[in-house]
Amino acid sequence: MGFALVLIFLFGFYLFLMKSSSIFPQRPFTFLYDLWVLLLVLRFLFSLIQILILCLFNFRFVEMTSNNKKKKTELCDLPKCLAPHILSWLPTKTAVTVSLLFMKGWWRSEMKNLSSLKFSFSDDQEEEHFVRFVDQVLRQRGNRKLDSFSLTLNDEIDGGFVTHLVDYPLDNGVEKLKLSIYDIKGNFQLSSRVFSQATLVTLKLATNRSLIWINGDDVAAAHLPCLKTLWLDDVLVADVKVFVRLLSRCPILEELVMIDMKWHNWEACFVVSASLRRLKIVWTDYVEMDEYDRCPQSVLFDTPNVLYLEYTDHIAGQYPLLKFSSLIEAKIRLEMIDEKEEEDEGQEVIVGDNATAFITGITSVRKLYLYANTIQVLHHYFDPPIPEFVYLTHLTIQSDKELGWDAIPELLSKCPHLETLVLEGLFHLATDVCGDVCPCRRNMEQAISYLVKSPVTHLEIYEGVVGKKRGEVTEDAARFGEQVRWFLMRMLHLQQVKIYGQTEDSVTALYDIATELRRLEGKASPNVQISVLQA
């Protein structure tokens, strides 16, 4: 149609020229004939170009289709035994999508044999769709053996549905159960069947606002003969009797993790287990610890086979028993509590007297991490001398610019076999009782040479921020260099010093400090190696 219109236009234009001029007086149609031939040639060339483009496009399409088929074929040609294993590592929703879109035939049927289910509900999902999806997956899977089940709820969902959903893994012999319930609506009570599931190897319960609680009825018939890992995150346990009974029903428990356990109001806090290998009791937020105006009344650890301990708490009123005879590594953060004579209601506030018993109970440790608060506790709440850490070879000390190093001199003197000393920060509150471990002392002539006697061969130092621009030397950088120089001039057995910077800029500034330290004359250990790395 377009070609015809162009032809008519050109013919009309030609007639107009014929009438208005004498360009072609003798052969009036010669020009039109030549134009017609030219247009035919152009038409032919245009068609040829179209054919070439179509051929090229079809070739690429066939090639892409072939590659896609090849990829799908490669995926589908994997051994059948790998299908459920691969899908089990994915969240259930993703596994279903992969199965439907990319897998054919028997691959889809393998969805029924998934050994692991992972469901997660958040505020960007509709409750009705989530419930329908879960029901369809469970209906398709049926009542087959289940290895692992994980449920995470970050938004409100019907409690009755959750109760019904938790029953599914319990009915199918689940071995690893993880329930993270951070929001819910309606009535929800964790089934007591969870604590009598004989097949459970790992049990992790996480919540907030005490949405999950454990009372005496829950553990009355508790029986967890295969449980090796128990994780309680902000779970409310009624009292110490419930907790002790629960642990007693886990005869081969190896790992116990308690996060934000609100046990300050218990009559006592007992952790009794002969099978435990790893024990972690921590608070996730420093502020949360400050919300409590009382310390635990009595804390008891009867855990003779624990190898790793991570413990955060206020100083207890007493420590009647601490069995850590097999301890290898520990991270300790003990907090002091402000002393008060009475509460608003006239009740006495229990305040921990000292940490002597606790520190004495962990002297068999070989690798020890002490938070800055613990250093304060050792100084203010430790009446007799610090006990000797005969087996300690690796010590890490966290520093705080608002807390002193008062306890460090005596602590170093009680580590006769210490090889590696790690200091997380050097800046601390200057006092008169730091001994010779820092140059900020007031009475330097009275200092006892704790550093000179130290057997430490490896010193690792982490700093905060030392200069924001390349080569910039700030007041903190100068103090940092002065403190490191202090160590080098007094520690006789040093073989290696590693300095870690937090940023590229601070590493650059530290390189300049290290260069000066290498040229330093009179070092206590002349052959010490100094290196700077980025943390």
From Swiss-Prot:
The chain crosses the membrane at residues 3-23, 37-57, 82-102. SUPFAM superfamilies: RNI-like. Component of SCF(ASK-cullin-F-box) E3 ubiquitin ligase complexes, which may mediate the ubiquitination and subsequent proteasomal degradation of target proteins. One of its GO terms (cellular component) is membrane. It comes from Arabidopsis thaliana. GO terms for biological process: protein ubiquitination. InterPro entries: FBD (IPR006566), FBL60-like (IPR055294), LRR_dom_sf (IPR032675), LRR_FXL15/At3g58940/PEG3-like (IPR055411). It comes from the Eukaryota. It is a multi-pass membrane protein. It is found in: Membrane. Residues 73-119 form the F-box domain. This is F-box protein At1g56610. Part of a SCF (ASK-cullin-F-box) protein ligase complex. Interacts with ASK4. The keyword Membrane applies. Pathway: Protein modification; protein ubiquitination. Keywords: Membrane, Transmembrane, Transmembrane helix, Ubl conjugation pathway. The F-box is necessary for the interaction with ASK proteins.
